[in-house]
C-alpha cells in the first residue's frame, strides 16, 4: 500500500511545475503573448514535454522509485523556464522591470481574476460534484473520459494561441470592417477543425476507452451514454470559442461578469440536481446546460457590442458543425469493427479521419466557399513563406 507520506510528497512534487511557472515565468509569458510570440512558449513546452516523456519512460523501465521519477521529471521545468526567460531578456532589453507599475492600466485585474476563478469552477465542478454526491468509482470512470476531452481541448487551443492579441489590436484601432472579415474567416477555419475533431471524438471515444481500459476490472469503464454526454459537453464548451475569444480581446470582463456568474451557478445547481437523479450523466448534463447558456449568450452579446454584425451567420455555422458531426458519426453506425489493440484503433481512426476531412471540406466549400477559399489561400501562402 502507498503511505500518506508518499502521496503527500508526490502531490508537492507535481505542484512544483505550476508554482515555478507562476512565480518565475508568468511575466515573460504575458509579454510574449501580448507580442503574439506564443511560438516561443510552445517551443519551450514541446522541449519540456519530450524530455519529460523520455525520463518517465526510461526510469519506469528501470523500475525507479516513483518520487525520484517525478522529481527528475518536474526538475525539467527549469529548462522550460530558462528558454522563455532568456528569449524575453534578449529581445526586450528596452523594458525596465523596475519601473513603477501603472495601476491604472491594470484596473480590470480583479475582474479578470474573478472570471478566472469562475472558469476553474466551470471545469472543476463535475469532479467535485461527483466526489461529494457519488463515489470514487464514478470519479475514476469520469477521469478516463475527461482525459480524452482534455487532450482534444489542448489540440484546439493550439489554433487560437496568440489570436486574442491580434483581434485586440483591430478592436483598439476600431477597424470594424477588417475585424468582421477576419473574425468571419477565423470562424470558418475554427469550425472546420472543430467539426473534424469532435466528429471523430463521437465516433472513436468508445473504441479508445475499450482498448485503454482493457484488463481493468475495478469498474465498468465502458459507458456509451456517459461518453456521448461528455463529448457533447466538450463540443458546447469549444463551439463558443470564437465569440469568447473576442471578449478577451476587447477586455470586456466587467461587462460580462454577471453572465459568467450565471453560467457558474447553472452548473452547480443543475449539476447537483442531475447528480442526484442520474449520477455522473446528470452532472455532465448540468455542465452541458451551462455551456449551452453561455453559447447562446455570447452568440448575441459579441455581435452587439464588439463586431456590430448579425448573429445569424455564426448561428448557421454552429448548426453546420452539428450537421457535419452527425454525418461523420454516421459512418460508425455502418462500419464499426471491434478494436482489440491500439494498432486496430489507429487504423480505424485513419479511416474515420479521411471520411471526416471529406465531409467537412465538402460542406465548407458548399456553404462557405468565399471564406473557405480565402483561408486556404492564407494557409498556402504561409506554407510557401516557411519553405
Locate each region found by the language model:
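Interfacial segments at transmembrane-helix termini and the short loops linking adjacent helices
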Residues: 1-14, 204-235
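Short runs within selected transmembrane alpha-helices of multi-pass transporters and secretion channels
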Residues: 10-33, 41-56, 69-85, 119, ...
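Interhelical loop/hinge segments that connect adjacent transmembrane helices in multipass membrane
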Residues: 82-124, 128, 166, 174-181, ...
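Helix-terminus/linker motif at the lipid-water interface of multi-pass membrane proteins
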Residues: 1, 58-63, 121-151, 169-170, ...
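Interfacial/gating helices of multi-pass transporter permease domains
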Residues: 66-71, 105-108, 112, 130-150, ...
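Membrane-proximal transmembrane or re-entrant/amphipathic helices at the cytosolic face
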Residues: 332-387
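Helix-loop junctions and terminal segments of transmembrane helices
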Residues: 33, 92-93, 149-187, 243-249
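Interfacial transmembrane-helix starts/ends
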Residues: 8, 106, 175-192, 196-204, ...
Amino acid at each position: 500500500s502507498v503511505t500518506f507520506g508518499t502521496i503527500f510528497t508526490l502531490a508537492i512534487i507535481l505542484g512544483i511545475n505550476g508554482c515555478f511557472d507562476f512565480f518565475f515565468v508568468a511575466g515573460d509569458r504575458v509579454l510574449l503573448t501580448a507580442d503574439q510570440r506564443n511560438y516561443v512558449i510552445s517551443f519551450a513546452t514541446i522541449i519540456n514535454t519530450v524530455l519529460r516523456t523520455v525520463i518517465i519512460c526510461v526510469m519506469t523501465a528501470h523500475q525507479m522509485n516513483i518520487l525520484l521519477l517525478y522529481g527528475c521529471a518536474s526538475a525539467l521545468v527549469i529548462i522550460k523556464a530558462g528558454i522563455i526567460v532568456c528569449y524575453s531578456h534578449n529581445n526586450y532589453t528596452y523594458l525596465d522591470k523596475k519601473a513603477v507599475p501603472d495601476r491604472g492600466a491594470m484596473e480590470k485585474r480583479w475582474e479578470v481574476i474573478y472570471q478566472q476563478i469562475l472558469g476553474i469552477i466551470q471545469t472543476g465542478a463535475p469532479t467535485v460534484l461527483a466526489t461529494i454526491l457519488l463515489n470514487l468509482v464514478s470519479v475514476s470512470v469520469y477521469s478516463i473520459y475527461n482525459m480524452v476531452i482534455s487532450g482534444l481541448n489542448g489540440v484546439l487551443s493550439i489554433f487560437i494561441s496568440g489570436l486574442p492579441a491580434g483581434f485586440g489590436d483591430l478592436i483598439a484601432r476600431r477597424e470594424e470592417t477588417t475585424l468582421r472579415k477576419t473574425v468571419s474567416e477565423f470562424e470558418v477555419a475554427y469550425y472546420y477543425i472543430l467539426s473534424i475533431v469532435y466528429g471523430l471524438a463521437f465516433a472513436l471515444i468508445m473504441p479508445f476507452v475499450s482498448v485503454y481500459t482493457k484488463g481493468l476490472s475495478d469498474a465498468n469503464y465502458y459507458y456509451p451514454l456517459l461518453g456521448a454526454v461528455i463529448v457533447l459537453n466538450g463540443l458546447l464548451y469549444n463551439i463558443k470559442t470564437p465569440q469568447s475569444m473576442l471578449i478577451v480581446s476587447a477586455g470586456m470582463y466587467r461587462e460580462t461578469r454577471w453572465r459568467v456568474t450565471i453560467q457558474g451557478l447553472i452548473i452547480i445547481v443543475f449539476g447537483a440536481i442531475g447528480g442526484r437523479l442520474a449520477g455522473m450523466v446528470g452532472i455532465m448534463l448540468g455542465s452541458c446546460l451551462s455551456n449551452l447558456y453561455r453559447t447562446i449568450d455570447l452568440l448575441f452579446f459579441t455581435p452587439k457590442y464588439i463586431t456590430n454584425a448579425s448573429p445569424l451567420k455564426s448561428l448557421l455555422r454552429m448548426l453546420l458543425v452539428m450537421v457535419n458531426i452527425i454525418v461523420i458519426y454516421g459512418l460508425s453506425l455502418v462500419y464499426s469493427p471491434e478494436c482489440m489493440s491500439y494498432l486496430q484503433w489507429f487504423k480505424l481512426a485513419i479511416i474515420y479521419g479521411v471520411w471526416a476531412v471529406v465531409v467537412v471540406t465538402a460542406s465548407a466549400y458548399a456553404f462557405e466557399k468565399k471564406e473557405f477559399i480565402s483561408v486556404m489561400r492564407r494557409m498556402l501562402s504561409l506554407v510557401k513563406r516557411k519553405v
